Amino acid sequence: MEEAKHFIAGEWTLPAQLETIAVVDPSDGQPFATIARGTAPDIERAVAAARDAFAGPWGAASAAERGRVLMRLSARVADHLEELAAIEARDTGKPLKQARADAAALARYFEFYAGAADKLHGETLPYQAGYTVLTVREPHGVTGHIVPWNYPMQIFGRSVGAALAAGNACVVKPAEDACLSVLRVAELAAEAGLPAGALNIVTGYGHEAGAALARHPGIDHISFTGSPATGKLVAQMAAENHVPVTLELGGKSPQLVFADADLDAALPVLVSAIVQNGGQTCSAGSRVLIERAVYEPLVERLATAFNGLRVGPSRADLDCGPLINAKQQQRVWDFLSDAQHDGIPMAAHGQVVADAPETGFYQAPALLRDVPPSHRLAQEEVFGPVLAAMRFVDEDEAVSLANGTPYGLVAGIWTRDGARQMRLARRLRAGQVFINNYGAGGGVELPFGGVGHSGHGREKGFEALYGFTALKTIAIRHG
């Protein structure tokens, strides 16, 4: 890939304003590369290229042909897995082992949607005599994808992979904080045979390139993953052109632990659910609600686990890497400062290793106990490695606490009681409920999305293909 350029119409092109943005390594706070600063004219060129591809070779390709291209792309990603992981680790600060898992997930997304491309179909509907009625699913046309900095490869894979499988041409605006891996994948896509213009990448700031994409009249669908505040702006901009939007926003996801749960099985999952990616995960299990009878012993065990966590540079491959930037680091500090001021006890915290650069954006994982349900630590998304522990007396209180935020992305339930498992799964306000696990290993086959302030629409799995298509009804009268 070429530094400080966009990928438009199958070529590396300079930004219209010839300006760049520094790429900073979160592990030491130092710039190590540059990207192009895209603006509205760059988005205009990218949309035009996508329109040409949709009207030309990509739009004319059969579903089977699209699937074969995506399968080749999956193989290319797998062949370059270590390279992509190294790029992602340095760009985001995440430990190399996590970046490696993200690259493997990217390959799997392309593999899954390659196989699904020719399985998407409409229906024949029963109707009155003399008519044949059927539905067909057609691609929207040109789809816009605004990709966040926390999981660039994974979210690119689940969003763009599904859109391409459905026959759309794509314009992608990755986050300026972490977009190098996405640019490399665009290059691999061209090598895999994706026609020029079917995939276009414009880098830049959200308020410039992102806003231009969201309000562009040539976009037929927008997929956005990010904060609720920005998601609201994107939806408003898209509404100017009556463009449908898939929003995957924040979360304040609870894990409910009952006294009959297998605590040995739950413990490492409760920790990893908030520590993974430094807590910078929309579905992070940031609240643990514990039944009163086992609250003290479980909090004690959690504290022991947290005290053993180590934080360091991405290359050290420890439990946590740095946060993405100084702004995010300050946000986490502000939450912890408010908690301390309000007398919320910190039960434990991890350790930043001694050789971590002082200029890096480090934050040790923190466990806070007895967090009041109304406190901002229990209500707002921290987006950092901070776990809020709370207690409950019975199921009703557990559900009240779990549903007591504006969010509704993920919930976890830990209990051996089968009746309780299904009863609570139906009562919890969340797009995903995991029972005696959390995340189900991140399977690409599982539809993912939220309710409330966590957004709407679904990505991942076969369900995502419906969002990237428009349903058309055809009624034929005979005789």
Residue ranges, per PLM feature:
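Residue-level signal for inorganic ion chemistry
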Residues: 29, 66, 88, 110, ...
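Conserved C-terminal structural/oligomerization subdomain of aldehyde/semialdehyde dehydrogenase
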Residues: 28-34, 256, 310, 355, ...
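Hydrophobic face of amphipathic alpha-helices that form TPR/SEL1-like repeat modules
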Residues: 1-28, 34
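ALDH superfamily catalytic-core signature
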Residues: 229-372, 435
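Glycine-rich loop-to-alpha-helix module at the N-terminal edge of alpha/beta enzyme cores
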Residues: 33-120
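Structural signal for hydrophobic packing residues in well-ordered secondary-structure cores
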Residues: 54, 58, 74-81, 85, ...
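Rossmann-like NAD(P) dinucleotide-binding subdomain of oxidoreductase/dehydrogenase enzymes
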Residues: 122-265, 317, 392
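A structural signal for short, well-ordered beta-strand elements
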Residues: 22, 36, 59, 92, ...
